[in-house]
Design a protein with these regions (language model features):
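Extracytoplasmic/secretory soluble proteins
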Residues: 17, 22-497
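Sec-dependent N-terminal signal peptides of Gram-positive bacterial secreted proteins and lipoproteins
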Residues: 1-25
């Protein structure tokens, strides 16, 4: 139900409030002059800038020690750019709705988390909620621009304009099958031959016959090889292979039928739980009651998952990593058009994404209180970080300047760079659909999709019976009009590339 509410909010949108952008015409990330004063690229010392307080809305569960850490952060940012940060964490379940209210009310703020899935980047950018950043970044964000993978900066542009600073992390999106390695080794199973959903059958059979307390499959939506428009479960998509210039209804494609037939076969054989379509079980890693699950990968994700689970997890890829709009806009920071200090906000984002001290302070907390640093520069969490300062690392900023944990591979960030280099751009990377002309039809189609897709994608119903009924209702809801509108916008976009 939460996905339905989020999507409807994204589609129906809200009234944007435009405000004049003012603020100090100051420089960017400070440097040290001959008198050991902090200076900007414009030659101003930090002290010469009028003090600014920047309001920053960030997604994540509020943490007990935020105020303590922000005292250290603000001492540093005041010295560097004469600004202090008013960090406001909004919990995961309320962030999207709260940001809509904040935006429609015209409340003044400076920076906010935005993405393809929360505080929607494309919709807010088109409706004037975010400041265009191209010139600001060139003037005040030079250091971070050198560090952020160009694929993020290019792929996140809407009609040639960038409206938020992407988090430098894994740029590609890759679905993998993750296995409970205790069960793999116990039954001497060979996962090296698993390259698709269909390849799982003999392994699932062994688990079903020998592990009565284990679900062979931890419930997941089947992977389908498309670049989706709007949400993954929605029907509008472009193919990754073949004719990539035609928008399609993915539920009319042969590969979808074959994949969902496999899922339903597994469901009938008891490899998938009988309540898969309605269950809210999140399948926590620390509970080893599963054999295989689908996850989104990043380099050395196995180490992260194994650390969280308390037992080893191993993986097999379902496809090569692709760069989608959703992956380049998965975590970003935007500057509000209501901000009175957009230049200073950009200076802060530049510092956040290029200064390892500030980035680690916001992410890990205070050394000696929240974490300890080893002689080799690696770190380990203390109880205070786990219990009182567990921040959403991916949502803050540049991942590749974070300290490594003591059990992280030494080449972790180099592996990220290799992963990004080898990620393949989607044929439609950079095309952002404006849903406003067909928002009524999309709302109706969303209702139909929420009725049919959960059971279909999880294998709980026969696709040969269910998909025809699903498609009939989609077209009754206005499917063809939406497909035509997407195609028209795409053709215009493609002609201008």
């Amino acid at each position: 139900m939460r996905k339905v509410v989020l999507l409807l909010a994204m589609v129906l949108g809200f009234v944007s409030v435009l405000a004049a952008c003012g603020g100090d015409q100051a420089g960017t990330d400070p440097q040290t002059n001959e008198n050991n004063e902090e200076t900007t690229h414009e030659g101003n010392t930090a002290e010469s800038l009028e003090h600014a307080t920047l309001v920053w809305y960030l997604i994540g569960t509020p943490q007990q020690d935020v105020d303590q850490v922000m005292e250290e952060v603000n001492a540093y940012t005041k010295e560097k750019i004469n600004a202090t940060i008013d960090l406001r964490l909004l919990d995961w379940g309320e962030f999207n709705e709260r940001m809509q209210v904040i935006t429609t009310s015209g409340e003044e703020y400076d920076i906010a988390f935005t993405s393809s899935w929360a505080n929607n980047y494309a919709l807010n950018s088109r409706r004037g909620a975010f400041v265009e950043l191209n010139d600001l970044m060139d003037k005040y964000g030079k250091e971070m621009k050198e560090l952020i993978d160009p694929a993020f900066l290019e792929g996140a542009q809407i009609d040639g304009k960038l409206f938020a600073v992407p988090t430098n992390k894994e740029v590609g999106q890759q679905a993998v099958l993750a296995f409970n390695n205790e069960l793999v080794e116990k039954h001497n199973l060979d996962i090296s031959t698993v390259n698709s959903l269909a390849d799982l059958e003999p392994l699932l059979k062994v688990i079903k016959e020998n592990e009565s307390d284990v679900s062979p499959i931890a419930t997941f939506d089947a992977y389908l090889p498309f670049d989706s428009i709007l949400q993954e479960e929605m029907p509008f998509a472009f193919r990754i292979d073949g004719n990539t210039d035609e928008v399609v209804n993915k539920y009319e494609e042969d590969v979808t039928m074959e994949t969902l037939k496999t899922m339903h076969d597994y469901y009938k054989k008891g490899y998938i739980r009988s309540d898969a379509a309605t269950s809210t079980d999140s399948w926590p890693l620390e509970t080893p009651n599963w054999f295989v699950r689908k996850e989104l990968y990043q380099p050395y994700a196995e180490s992260i998952w194994s650390r969280a689970a308390g037992y080893e997890i191993v993986t097999r890829p379902l496809h090569e990593p692709y760069v989608f709009n959703n992956s380049v806009t998965g975590s970003m920071q935007a500057i509000s058009t209501t901000s009175k200090n957009p230049e200073r906000a950009m200076m802060f984002l530049n510092l956040l994404n290029s200064d390892p001290y500030l980035r680690n302070l916001l992410d890990k907390g205070i050394e000696g209180i929240h974490y300890e640093e080893n002689e080799d520069g690696t770190i380990k969490d203390l109880d205070a970080r786990i219990e009182r300062y567990n921040m959403p690392s991916f949502a803050i900023g540049n991942q590749l300047i974070l300290k490594l944990y003591e059990d992280d591979p030494a080449d972790k960030w180099e592996a990220f760079e290799d992963f990004n280099t080898n990620s393949v751009p989607s044929p439609v990377l950079g095309f952002y659909f404006d849903s406003n002309p067909v928002r009524t039809e999309i709302a109706a189609i969303n209702n139909v999709t929420s009725e049919f897709s959960p059971a279909l994608l999880k294998g709980a119903v026969d696709p040969e019976e269910y998909i025809p009924a699903f498609n009939k209702k989609l077209y009754e809801a206005g499917m063809q009009k939406v497909l035509d509108e997407i195609q028209s916008q795409y053709d215009e976009w493609k002609a201008n590339q």
